[in-house]
Swiss-Prot record:
Gene3D superfamilies: 1.20.1270.10, 3.30.420.40, Actin, Chain A, domain 4 (3.90.640.10), Substrate Binding Domain Of DNAk, Chain A, domain 1 (2.60.34.10). GO terms for molecular function: ATP binding; ATP-dependent protein folding chaperone; unfolded protein binding. It comes from the Bacteria. This is Chaperone protein DnaK. Residues 600-611 have a biased composition (Acidic residues). Belongs to the heat shock protein 70 family. Residues 577-611 are annotated as: Disordered. Induction: By stress conditions e.g. heat shock.
Length: 611
């Protein structure tokens, strides 16, 4: 069975892993890094992903970051006259990770397990699945990030019974999950979180501070300057990381703006204490879901065996201190917070292929599901933290006499009124026979699969008429749209490959021109002048083709020149061998006269060295 890769599709960084020899292993990208920035840039119709895209974000306005925050919404970003959905941008990142995996494994990869924040709703999960399809991946399973982290942590500890709290503070989302590990079963007891809280927000408080300080000093608002803002973002991210290891850092941004007197520079020392003061509200926001998850699980903090930190933002000392205070436990530092989620996804891939045995994963739905009933009330059918997959039915009736149809308004959330919850979709059960209110029996059934994706059925028990939908949010993509995007992604991948081949061809041609110059110089006066002239002429023809950028002409002229250079190189070797043969003959005659002395001298030298 072909390999199933595990992908952590993150807000700021992504990571890909695979099972090898019974262990999950992170796959490095072509630059040799184990994580790839979730950044996509467009430049002259060329797409760049990762570090190379992030590096030129300051100068390229067509750079897209943190798109995960828009998954499951109708957000679109316009680039070079074309609108892109979050699914399409995510698919470009996934294609890049898929290519890294294929290069590493030496085989085509078509299947993946992709992780999502535990608190992602149905629309966000569907969007992630669609992104995988657009990237040419069969998404075998969507699993929650904290659950994946627990899988990676617990793979070697299956014989131990443990209660674990996974605290996952990533670049754009926050999740906390409580799990029980016993005999290879990973059971999620409860989960909570905030999909609008992460490392980006910690960067933002530093940016706001820098903007305020600069405005106070120079009366110029840097937040209105797009290029200055990108430089501030880079500086804020670097300062945040620095302050995890040192107590103060220097932020220096020369020529950040200009005033009447000339260029202005931003110079500021940021202390860890100041950063903790600026971000105190964000740290506190992580604790409320932590308390809720513990309460839902029915656990006291003292009952926990381990607290596992996941996500790069958990390196912030104030975050570590807060969770330690809240749980009374020293956080476990035996996992890499940037890689553990991808490793867990790879383990789940191994479970699905049969490479990993004796592991059972029981996850939960993060939010309650139900329908709108009379008076705009939200009636829950499936409570949050219910183990999935699951199915639940309930019988409802009509609200008016002779009602010909019922509207089924499907919702997800925790608030008592429908208007305050997230609409997942609507559908109608029509052609109800005339009957007084309260008489028709309409059974509504919710199914949640192992990916956390919802299917809803409504059935008139009197007539057995049934209507069903797989929930697609208002922002969801139809099958036709996904198929179109798949084809576009494949076409773009082909175009990217073609561009790569073009660059390689030009590089080879340039290298051949350089090599020809060297060979001609070495052969000067040693071969017939006509042959040298022929090589020089072919070289100039290739240079002319390179300047014109005519690819077919470059290829033809390169092949012609290569043949001439090969013939010349053979002559160069023949001459070198002939010269070596002559020198050997002369040396042999000389050695015959002095052989005896040479041997004695060599022996004498060796003995002397040994002493």
């Amino acid at each position: 069975m072909s390999k199933i890769i595990g992908i952590d599709l993150g807000t700021t960084n992504s990571c890909v892993a695979v099972m090898e020899g019974g262990e999950p292993k992170v796959i490095p990208n072509p630059e040799g890094n184990r994580t790839t920035p979730s950044v996509v840039a467009f430049k002259n119709e060329e797409r760049q992903v990762g570090e190379v895209a992030k590096r030129q974000a300051i100068t390229n306005p067509n750079t897209i970051m943190s798109v995960k925050r828009h998954m499951g919404t109708d957000y679109k970003v316009e680039v070079e006259g074309k609108d892109y959905t979050p699914q399409e941008i995510s698919a470009i990142i996934l294609q890049n990770l898929k290519a890294s995996a294929e290069a590493y494994l030496g085989e085509t990869v078509t299947k993946a397990v992709i992780t999502v924040p535990a608190y992602f709703n149905d629309a966000e999960r569907q969007a992630t699945k669609d992104a995988g399809r657009i990237a040419g991946l069969e998404v075998e399973r969507i699993i929650n990030e904290p659950t994946a982290a627990a899988l990676a942590y617990g793979l070697e500890k299956q014989d131990e019974e443990q209660k674990i709290l996974v605290y996952d503070l990533g670049g754009g989302t926050f999740d906390v999950s409580i799990l029980e590990l016993a005999d290879g079963t990973f059971e999620v007891i409860s989960t909570a979180g905030d999909n609008r809280l992460g490392g980006d927000d910690f960067d933002q408080v530093i940016i706001d501070h820098l903007v305020a300080e600069f405005k106070k000093e120079n009366n110029i608002d840097l937040s209105q300057d797009k290029m200055a803002l990108q430089r501030l973002k880079d500086a804020a991210e670097k300062a945040k990381k620095d302050l995890s290891g040192v107590t103060q850092t220097q932020i220096s941004l020369p020529f950040i703006s200009a005033g009447a007197a000339g260029p202005l520079h931003l110079e500021l020392t940021l202390t860890r204490a100041k950063f903790e003061e600026l971000s105190a509200g964000l740290v506190e926001r992580t604790l409320e879901p932590t308390r809720r998850a513990l309460k839902d699980a029915g656990f006291a903090p003292s009952e926990l065996d381990k607290v596992i930190l996941v996500g790069g933002s958990t390196r912030i000392p104030a975050v570590q201190e807060a969770i330690k205070r809240e749980t009374g436990k020293e956080p476990y530092k035996g996992v890499n917070p940037d890689e553990v989620v991808a490793l867990g996804a790879a383990v789940q891939g191994g479970v699905l292929t049969g490479d990993v045995e004796g592991v059972l994963l029981l996850d939960v739905t993060p939010l309650s599901l139900g329908i709108e009933t009379m008076g705009g009330v939200f009636t829950k059918l499936i409570e949050r933290n219910t183990t999935i997959p699951t199915s639940k039915s309930q019988v409802f009736s009509t609200a008016a006499d002779n009602q010909p149809a019922v509207d089924i308004h499907v919702l997800q959330g925790e608030r008592p009124m429908s208007a305050d919850n997230k609409t997942l979709g609507r559908f109608q059960l029509t052609d109800l026979p005339p009957a007084p209110r309260g008489i028709p029996q309409i059974e509504v059934t919710f199914d949640i699969d192992a990916n956390g994706i919802v299917n809803v059925r409504a059935k008139d028990l009197g007539t057995s008429k049934e209507q069903a939908i797989t929930i697609q949010s208002s922002s969801g993509l139809s099958d036709e749209e996904v198929e179109r995007m798949v084809q576009e992604a494949e076409a773009n991948a082909d175009a990217d490959q073609k561009r790569k081949e073009e660059v390689e061809l030009r590089n080879e041609a340039d290298q051949l021109v350089f090599q020809t110059d060297k060979v001609v110089k070495d052969l000067e006066g040693k071969v017939d002048a006509a042959e040298v002239a022929k090589a020089t002429e072919a070289k100039e023809a290739l240079q002319a083709a390179i300047e014109k950028n005519e690819l077919e002409e470059i290829r033809a002229k390169k092949d012609a020149l290569q043949e001439i250079v090969q013939q010349l190189t053979v002559k160069l070797y023949e001459q070198a061998q002939a010269a070596a043969g002559q020198a050997e003959g002369a040396q042999g005659a000389q050695d015959a006269g002095t052989k005896k002395d040479n041997v004695v001298d060599a022996e004498f030298e060796e003995v002397k060295e040994d002493k």
